[in-house]
């Protein structure tokens, strides 16, 4: 089922003398109702396209693409759409095509949104091992919510109860391996910048 992105919607727009829609001379703020699904949405850039399957409650023979910007989404927090998410929206005809003016979930509910978040340059990924219970080592909770009684103390790096992290041979071995790696050109420049 393909979609037509440049197809004009002329219903409800004033007609010129020759009977065609007079988009350029009319008030461009005519608002229409539509519903459909999110075709795609770029979370980093904050925009995407909706595939409109109904206009003013009537099924369309050929689905239409409608531009959507994150500022038009009705939801809390980080605004985005998930591919295939059902939406209801208002839209208008602009010089660039069809453009949404407000987007909600079905029945006016807030949009669900994408689980994806934009990658930020320079931000390192959080270590998986850092988000675990210090009491039992479980990944689904922290020590204050741990249902087990206090466990014997153990190394936080390798979980061995025979030593603490300060004397951990695995951590010392990992640090030694990092020292043996060749220094990159960027790392050589760091001392010069610091001076």
From Swiss-Prot:
The keyword Cytoplasm applies. Transmembrane segments: none annotated. It is found in: Cytoplasm; Rough endoplasmic reticulum; Cytoplasm, P-body; Cytoplasm, Stress granule. It comes from the Eukaryota. The keyword Kinase does not apply. PROSITE patterns: CSD_2 (PS51857), ZF_CCHC (PS50158). A zinc finger (CCHC-type) spans 131-148, 153-170. GO terms for cellular component: cytoplasm; cytoplasmic stress granule; nucleolus; nucleus; P-body; rough endoplasmic reticulum. Residues 118-127 have a biased composition (Basic residues). Zn(2+) 1 binds at residues 133, 136, 141, 146. One of its GO terms (biological process) is stem cell population maintenance. GO terms for molecular function: mRNA binding; RNA binding; zinc ion binding. Belongs to the lin-28 family. Residues 98-127 are annotated as: Disordered. RNA-binding protein that inhibits processing of pre-let-7 miRNAs and regulates translation of mRNAs that control developmental timing, pluripotency and metabolism. Seems to recognize a common structural G-quartet (G4) feature in its miRNA and mRNA targets. 'Translational enhancer' that drives specific mRNAs to polysomes and increases the efficiency of protein synthesis. Its association with the translational machinery and target mRNAs results in an increased number of initiation events per molecule of mRNA and, indirectly, in mRNA stabilization. Disulfide bonds: none annotated. Residues 107-130 are annotated as: Flexible linker. Gene3D superfamilies: Nucleic acid-binding proteins, Zinc finger, CCHC-type. This is Protein lin-28 homolog A. The CCHC zinc fingers interact with the GGAG motif at the 3' end of let-7 miRNAs precursors, more generally they bind the 5'-NGNNG-3' consensus motif with micromolar affinity. The CSD domain recognizes the loop at the 5' end. The flexible linker allows accommodating variable sequences and lengths among let-7 family members. The lineage of its organism: Eukaryota, Metazoa, Chordata, Craniata, Vertebrata. Residues 33-106 form the CSD domain. Keywords: Cytoplasm, Endoplasmic reticulum, Metal-binding, Nucleus, Repeat, RNA-binding, RNA-mediated gene silencing, Zinc, Zinc-finger. Monomer. Zn(2+) 2 binds at residues 155, 158, 163, 168.
């Amino acid at each position: 089922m393909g979609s037509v992105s440049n197809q004009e919607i002329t219903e409800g727009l004033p007609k010129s003398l020759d009977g065609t829609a007079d988009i350029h001379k009319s008030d461009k703020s005519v608002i229409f109702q539509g519903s459909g699904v999110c075709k795609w949405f770029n979370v980093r850039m904050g925009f995407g396209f909706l595939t409109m399957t109904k206009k003013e409650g009537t099924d369309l023979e050929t689905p239409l693409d409608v531009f959507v910007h994150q500022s038009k989404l009705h939801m809390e927090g980080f605004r985005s759409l998930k591919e295939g998410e059902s939406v209801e929206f208002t839209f208008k005809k602009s010089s660039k095509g069809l453009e949404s003016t407000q987007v909600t979930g079905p029945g006016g509910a807030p949009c669900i949104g994408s689980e994806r978040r934009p990658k930020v340059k320079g931000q390192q990924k959080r270590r998986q091992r850092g988000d675990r219970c210090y009491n039992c080592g479980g990944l689904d909770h922290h020590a204050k919510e741990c249902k087990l009684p206090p466990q014997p103390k153990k190394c936080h790096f390798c979980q061995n109860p025979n030593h603490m992290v300060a004397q951990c041979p695995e951590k010392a071995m990992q640090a030694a391996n990092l020292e043996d790696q060749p220094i990159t050109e960027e790392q050589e420049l760091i001392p010069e910048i610091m001076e």
